[in-house]
Amino acid sequence: MTGINRSIILDRRPSLIDRHLPETSQVQRLLRREGKAHVFHDRETLDRVTQVIIEFGERTGSEDPDDDYERYGLYFSEPIGCIIRKEGSLILLYYGEIKTVKSTGEYYSIPRISPRETS
């Protein structure tokens, strides 16, 4: 089965959106604290990737009762974003993920290298 077949609601907290958009204060904070940030190319790319994952994404990871999230993802043929490193290097990203809170259906999107590995 593809796509997200449950009711979901976009989590509109700016902190969850801005941390994945280039040139925001959230990204600058991540670079200072963690030395890297995973960002989409721009807001339009974030919105497009989100819609495609909602329609065609695959559930990832194993069913983990201790994990509060469900994850859906999809590989794209063109880069959707990059990892920005503090020293200035970039790694292109081709995988997008929607992370959904199991109990509320609230979600946000993340550009990644690959699906998250769950234990």
Task: Please provide the spans of the model-predicted regions.
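Functional cores of ribonucleases/endoribonucleases
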Residues: G3-S119
